[in-house]
């Protein structure tokens, strides 16, 4: 009943009246055709065949050495090498780092074979292998931002391996198959033959035979090669491997691949990485040139040979954009003036109803008109000056705002009858307070008339203030004398009492 309801056809699975597409998951789907193995993505990107073979061998050696340091089982190491070979039949060595993919395959294989290892341990092991390869001193890996970036790259590489392989990561290893076939041939007691066959099988992982042939055929080839090496006779009429479904041509091809592995010279990893890097730069430059860019990504400034800017009708927006800005023109003029050594001409046009005067004519204007003097231009507003000039402070010589802002020394007024002792002290003292202002007035005054105009302007102020202080002093003197008279009178009356 069930057989009638569902039937399998070449187009899919027929269930009832509906035809469903089927997905066949089998290890035979992981095998590569001969044409696909000859034209790999790395060869398409410009890497020669020998360089690609060396890169595959080096990558598988790294996986094997890392598995030994991580104490992984041999099955996990074999799985990692097979995944490495499968991935680089779909992607190129130019676009993907060989070392990063090897780390990802080790980490993925440890989880597949139920012997997981931390990704940090995988990174440390590969770091140690690089130090041994470059003959460097053993130093621990620093956990900085570079380590975090490397960890993220390995995680991304592992996801990429899963995506490219379609999550078909199961590998059938011929280890158990070798033991089973030797039991059929009644040679399982010969430990030397078993171990040699096992060794050939482990060495064949560095080649691409696991991507091209079935594991049963590989097991037969390893037994055949071990028996020939140890000179152990096996049935040959007919050949014993016909019993297990292997052909003589496949056996010979696998044996030749394994023997070529022993005749190859040891590859220089630094030289291989240099070749890959050069090819990568060449491809990037070719892409940039095709897009009309420089190798660093900036656009080219040269025009096309048949392009004429004068023949193109510019729109108003383009004309406005092509017009130079006034700031650029002004900056260009200033640069020309600096080169020529000429001064910037002053404009004679009035600004806000006043004619702007230059720095050279400032001294003459100050001597003729007091309103243009620096002391009045820097002085405060009339209300504030009036409020501060009549402050109760008696030490107005050093704290008056008008005096602190003026650049010339104060003019000593001569009033004849009244002579202050403080004035004599100021006149004879070398540490006069306004001596620093005197130095600054010499350095900042532009002409003698400039300083004389400021002295005349300040003298009027000092005269007015001095009259005020004289009146204040006379009043205070009267009050003091009156108090003294009172004290004297009270004391005299007390004496009389």
UniProtKB/Swiss-Prot annotation:
CDD domains: CYCLIN_CCNL2_rpt2. Residues 293-497 are annotated as: Disordered. SUPFAM superfamilies: Cyclin-like. One of its GO terms (molecular function) is cyclin-dependent protein serine/threonine kinase regulator activity. The keyword Transmembrane does not apply. Pfam families: Cyclin_C, Cyclin_N. GO terms for biological process: regulation of transcription by RNA polymerase II. GO terms for cellular component: nuclear speck. Residues 388-403 have a biased composition (Low complexity). Residues 366-404 are annotated as: RS. The keyword Transit peptide does not apply. InterPro entries: Cyclin-like_dom, Cyclin-like_sf, Cyclin/Ssn8, Cyclin_C-dom, Cyclin_N. Residues 61-163 are annotated as: Cyclin-like 1. Residues 357-371, 452-461, 469-491 have a biased composition (Basic and acidic residues). Keywords: Cyclin, Nucleus, Repeat, Transcription, Transcription regulation. Coiled coil: none annotated. It is found in: Nucleus speckle; Nucleus, Nucleoplasm. Residues 176-260 are annotated as: Cyclin-like 2. Involved in pre-mRNA splicing. Belongs to the cyclin family. Cyclin L subfamily. This is Cyclin-L2. It comes from Xenopus tropicalis (Western clawed frog). The lineage of its organism: Eukaryota, Metazoa, Chordata, Craniata, Vertebrata. The gene is ccnl2.
